[in-house]
Amino acid sequence: MTITPRRERIRSATVAEIKNLARQLLVAGGPPAISLRAIARDMGMTAPAIYRYFPSLDALVGDLCEDLFDELREWVEAARDACPADEPLPRLTEMARAFRRWSVAHPAEFGLMFGSPVPGVTRYEADCVGPDHAGARFGAPFLQAFAEVWHTSRFPTPPVELIEQKLGRYIAPHEVSHGAGLPVEVVYAYLSGWTRLYGLVAMEVFGHLGWAVTEVEPLFELELAAFVAQMSA
């Protein structure tokens, strides 16, 4: 059995405490409230001492984003795993619902991850180029479930010629699908579905639907049903 050295355990605990306090500040006051100085004060540290753990505020925000993406991914995967493994469409549907539930319950965290550009987040997301990035890990279960639906039902998609003509120069199916081998028209359907899901959830989280509906969940369920119907045709 490998025993973690005491110094390493203490450092890991301190890093976790710093990120926990950063999240508390985020929830209390949004991204501008996250401050290395405020965290150091709450921990009884000097401001320079905190730089032994994070070289900059951007680095801390990027690390916090990684934790949040992993937390959201685990939430979505739990919803997926509660459905039978041989029913990919219900699994994808429950994943979409789980994404909405987490997002609505964590508006500040959602805002940091998916909202207005914040330097640390912008830099972090710019590095999302491989499957090991937390943002890619979050998207992977959705892509896998979507691919399973496609391989099971071969749902209708726009003509490949149309997609090639309109998006051929701007889309990289292999990169988007992380090597899943999906044809370009299916990758387009995946992107279309994701932007539809994300757009509605973002409008709800940021309070932009109050002019139209008093309760967003029924609208979400109607949109989700319409999306599912497209893949069931």
Language-model segment annotations:
Residues A140-A233:
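C-terminal peripheral helix-coil segments that are non-catalytic and often amphipathic
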Residues G44-F54:
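Short hydrophobic/aromatic patch on the recognition helix
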Residues M1-G29, A33-A38, D42, P55-G62, ...:
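Basic, helix-initiating cap at the start of DNA-binding domains
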